[in-house]
UniProtKB/Swiss-Prot annotation:
Protein name: Ribosomal RNA small subunit methyltransferase A
InterPro entries: KsgA/Erm (IPR001737), rRNA_Ade_diMease-like_C (IPR023165), rRNA_Ade_Mease_Trfase_CS (IPR020596), rRNA_Ade_methylase_Trfase_N (IPR020598), rRNA_adenine_dimethylase (IPR011530), SAM-dependent_MTases_sf (IPR029063)
Taxonomic path: Bacteria, Bacillati, Bacillota, Bacilli, Lactobacillales
Single GO MF descriptor: 16S rRNA (adenine(1518)-N(6)/adenine(1519)-N(6))-dimethyltransferase activity
GO cellular component: cytosol
Organism: Pediococcus pentosaceus (strain ATCC 25745 / CCUG 21536 / LMG 10740 / 183-1w)
Binding site for S-adenosyl-L-methionine: N31, L33, G58, E79, D104, N129
Length: 297
């Protein structure tokens, strides 16, 4: 099948939308990608091969799904919009290695669907053009899952991509940066102009790759508790770490003494702002807080 016939070709996309009387649903964050080169570049960035089974979220009319299916062993796509199921039945009919389930991925038992539709013998990847309004929940769901995902390559709002990949000292660096980079290596692969979507969104996008980290030299006992510490430290970005910790744990003399002990032991300047601390700094900070017995108010 050549590019002229591909779903992602602008002419064919319009024809499909007209045939089915479709219009993008803002409530579901739908924007249809109509640039074949961008679609191919996404699949290239994911390094999809016949050795891979791929999970996709929000296939839409199948533009990206098709390109993934040309290279992957099998594609398991989650589509929340029931009205698109008949469309996908037609547009993806030439391919026998695609399974589309009509489910909200945030409510679905993804592990069960993977077990039912994929053989578990191949590498597992997530490749998707994510709805902007649920990008972060979807990423957190897959990062926290027990699925052995080898790589994620996802399109998202450029602003969110910059936050995910920001480094200490960057203005975009925040709790999301720390929480994601605690588990994943992140990299912006390339930017995507709003011009290549129908309808055209108000913001540009970016393709981000995420690969699992092996771990850190020290680890927190409980991830969720660690994340609460991180979010708490960033609650007031303009405040230094000393003031933020007092806001979290209290200002009583004995509490302030414990906070001072924590910072002194770690060599952290009390006047530094949280966006200057590395992921490892936050892990050590959290662990030391636990040892000191500090409890959030």
């Amino acid at each position: 099948m050549n590019n002229q016939m591909d779903i992602g070709n602008p002419t064919r996309t319009r024809a499909i939308l007209e045939k089915y009387g479709l219009s993008a649903k803002k409530s579901l964050g739908q924007n249809f990608l109509t640039d074949p080169n961008v679609l191919l570049n996404i699949v290239d960035a994911a390094e999809v091969s016949p050795e891979d089974d791929v999970i996709e979220v929000g296939p839409g009319i199948g533009s990206l799904t098709e390109q993934i299916a040309k290279r992957a062993h099998h594609v398991l796509a989650f589509e929340i919009d029931r009205n698109l199921m008949n469309v996908l039945d037609e547009t993806l009919s030439p391919y026998d290695n695609i399974t589309v389930v009509n489910q909200d991925v945030l409510k679905a038992n993804v592990n069960e669907e993977v077990e039912n539709h994929l053989d578990g013998k191949r590498r597992l990847k997530l490749v998707a053009n994510l709805p902007y309004y649920i990008t972060t929940p979807i990423l957190k769901t897959f990062m926290a899952s027990t699925l052995p995902i080898d790589k994620m390559v996802v399109m998202m709002q450029k602003e969110v991509a910059e936050r995910l990949t920001a480094q200490p000292g960057d203005k975009e660096y925040g709790s999301l940066s720390v929480v994601v980079q605690y588990r994943m290596n992140t990299q912006i692969e390339f930017d995507v102009s709003s011009k290549v979507f129908v309808p055209r969104p108000k913001v540009d996008s970016a393709i981000v790759s995420l690969t699992p980290r092996a771990g850190w030299e020290v680890m927190p006992e409980d991830d969720k508790d660690f994340f609460k510490t991180v979010h708490g430290c960033f609650m007031h970005r303009r405040k230094n770490i000393w003031n933020n910790m007092q806001g979290l744990y209290g200002k009583e003399p004995e509490i302030k003494a414990k906070i001072q002990n924590v910072l002194d032991d770690l060599g952290i300047d009390p006047q530094v702002r949280p966006e200057r601390l590395t992921v490892l700094d936050f892990i050590k900070l959290h662990n030391r807080i636990q040892i000191e017995g500090l409890k959030r108010k």
